Design a protein with these regions (language model features):
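Active-site neighborhoods of metal-dependent hydrolases
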Residues: 128-133, 138-165, 172-192, 237-240, ...
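Short hydrophobic alpha-helical runs that function as membrane-insertion/retention elements
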Residues: 85-87, 187, 218-219, 247-249
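Active-site environment of divalent metal-dependent phosphoester hydrolases
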Residues: 65-68, 92-95, 191-195, 223-229, ...
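Metal-associated gating/positioning segment near the N- to mid-region
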Residues: 40, 45-115
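Histidine-rich, glycine-flanked metal-binding segment
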Residues: 2-56
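Divalent metal-binding pocket/active-site signature
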Residues: 177-235
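Divalent metal-coordination and catalytic microenvironments
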Residues: 9, 29, 50, 61, ...
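Core domains of carbohydrate- and sulfate-ester-processing enzymes
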Residues: 118-127
Length: 423
C-alpha cells in the first residue's frame, strides 16, 4: 500500500520533460511512480487538480549561512518548496577566521557589540559545525562553500595589492582544509572586499586546487554591469587554464548600457561550453539584486575597507569629488535613485530603512548622486539594498535557456519577528 497518492496534478518532474497532468505515488518518503493515472491502494489520497506537483527545489545561490545556524526552521525557503541551498556564496562564509579575527569577535561579544548573525563565525568549518548541537534540527539541506573573501581577509587583509607567494600557499592550505572538512567548493566575490583586489595568478592557483579536489567554483564576477562581457571573458579564460567547473552566480546585465544583450551574453557562455569548458550559471527569477551601496564605489576607495571609504567621503576632498562625478554619470535622475531600495541598516540608521534613494533625495533636498554619498556616510556603508538594475526581458529570456539554474540570493529567514532585529 502507498503512503500517499496525489491525483490529477500538473507534474513537472525536473528533467526538462514537458509537464503533464497525472498522478504521483509516494512510499516511505520517496516518489515511486509518476504516471497519467495510477490505480493503487493508498493510506491517503489527495486530489491536487489545478496544482503543480514537482520535486523540492535546489536554490543554487543562497546566503542562509548564519541564518541557518541561528534558526534551523528555514521557513522563508521551505514554504517556497526549497529543500537544498548552496551557501557560502559571493566569497563570503562564516569561516575561516584567523586567531586575531576570532579574538576580535570574542572581544566584541563581551562588549555587547556583536549582532546575532556575527556571532556565527569560526576558525574552521569543523568548528562552525560544533556551534549546532545534535538536538538542533534542520529543515533544509545545506551545501557549504568556503568563501575566498573570507580566506583573503584573514591572510592578506583589506589592502589593495596582489597576494604574496607565501600568502597564496597559506590560502591554499586553508582551502584544502575546508574541502577535507566537508565543503563542496569555493566561492569568489570579485565585486566585494577583499576579493576585488585578487589578481589572475592568485585566482588561478586556488581554482586549480578546486579542480584537483573535483570541487565547484562559484563566481560573483568583477562586473555585472557595463563591463559584464569582459568579466565573463576572465572566467572563461580561468576555466580554460584550470579545467575546473566554474559556475557564474546570478548572471545578469545590471546596467542600462547592456540591457537587451542577454542573447549575446549567453552565446558567449554557450561557445565556451561547446569548446569543452565546464561553465554553468544561475539567474534570478526577478529583475532586482541585493547588495549594498558601497558595492558601487570604485576599488581604490575601498583600499583598507569601508571605514576608509567613509573617511574619504567625509573629507570632501578630491576623492569625494571623483566618486560624486562617477555617481553623476551613472545615476543622474530621480528614477535612478528609486531603483535603490534600502531594506535595512542593522540599526545604524533607521531613518533610511524601507526607503529608496529617490525618496531620501526628496526628503533631504539633494540630487540623487549627492544623496547616495550622504546615505553611505550616515549608514557607515552598512546598508543592505534591493537594486532594480535589470531589464525584465533579459531576465525572462535567460530563464528559458538550457543550462541555466535559478538562485534566490536570499536567506532562509524565520517568520519569528524577534529574529529580525534592526529591520
Amino acid at each position: 500500500m502507498l503512503d500517499l497518492l496525489l491525483k490529477n496534478g500538473l507534474i513537472c518532474d525536473g528533467t526538462a520533460a514537458s509537464p503533464f497532468v497525472g498522478d504521483a505515488a509516494i512510499q516511505n518518503g520517496r516518489i515511486v511512480e509518476l504516471a497519467p493515472s495510477i490505480c493503487a491502494d493508498s493510506a491517503e489520497t489527495l486530489d491536487v487538480s489545478g496544482l503543480v506537483v514537482a520535486p523540492a527545489f535546489i536554490d543554487m545561490h543562497s546566503h542562509s549561512d548564519a541564518w541557518f545556524m541561528a534558526d534551523g526552521r528555514c521557513e522563508a525557503k521551505l514554504y517556497q518548496g526549497v529543500a537544498t541551498e548552496i551557501v557560502g556564496q559571493c566569497g563570503s562564509s562564516c569561516f575561516p577566521r584567523s586567531v586575531s579575527q576570532m579574538t576580535k569577535v570574542r572581544r566584541a561579544a563581551e562588549e555587547g557589540k556583536l549582532s546575532k548573525m556575527e556571532a556565527y563565525q569560526a576558525g574552521t568549518f569543523e568548528k562552525l559545525l560544533r556551534k549546532r548541537g545534535p538536538e538542533d534540527g534542520m529543515s533544509t539541506n545545506l551545501v557549504q562553500l568556503v568563501g575566498h573573501n573570507a580566506i583573503r581577509r584573514g591572510v592578506v587583509g583589506l589592502v589593495k595589492r596582489p597576494a604574496w607567494e607565501d600568502e597564496i600557499r597559506l590560502s591554499k592550505y586553508l582551502l584544502q582544509q575546508a574541502f577535507e572538512q566537508g565543503c563542496w567548493g569555493m566561492s569568489l566575490g570579485l565585486g566585494y572586499l577583499p576579493g576585488l583586489f585578487a589578481d589572475t595568478h592568485e585566482l588561478e592557483e586556488l581554482i586549480r586546487l578546486c579542480y584537483i579536489y573535483d570541487q565547484l567554483v562559484t563566481v560573483h564576477m568583477r562586473d555585472e554591469g557595463d563591463r559584464v562581457f569582459e568579466a565573463l571573458d576572465e572566467m572563461i579564460d580561468l576555466a580554460r587554464r584550470t579545467h575546473a567547473h566554474i559556475h557564474i552566480a546570478h548572471l545578469k546585465l545590471g546596467a542600462k548600457s547592456v540591457w537587451g544583450r542577454a542573447e549575446a551574453l549567453y552565446e558567449k557562455l554557450l561557445r565556451a561550453r561547446e569548446e569543452g569548458l565546464e561553465l554553468t550559471a544561475d539567474v534570478y527569477p526577478y529583475p532586482a539584486c541585493s547588495t549594498g551601496l558601497s558595492s558601487r564605489l570604485p576599488d581604490w576607495a575601498l583600499d583598507g575597507g569601508t571605514d576608509h571609504a567613509c573617511r574619504l567621503l567625509a573629507a570632501r576632498g578630491r576623492e569625494h569629488d571623483e566618486i560624486l562625478e562617477l555617481f553623476r554619470e551613472k545615476y543622474p535622475a530621480r528614477e535612478d535613485g528609486d531603483r535603490f531600495y534600502i531594506i535595512g541598516t542593522g540599526g545604524v540608521c533607521p531613518e533610511v530603512d524601507g526607503k529608496t534613494v529617490g525618496q531620501l533625495s526628496e526628503e533631504w533636498g539633494l540630487p540623487v548622486p549627492e544623496t547616495m554619498i550622504e546615505t553611505l556616510l550616515r549608514t557607515r556603508c552598512q546598508e543592505d539594498c534591493i537594486i532594480f538594475n535589470m531589464d525584465e526581458g533579459d531576465v525572462e529570456w535567460l530563464l528559458r535557456q538550457p543550462g541555466i539554474a535559478i538562485g534566490s540570493d536570499a536567506s532562509c529567514r524565520p517568520f519569528d519577528p524577534a529574529m529580525s532585529d534592526g529591520k
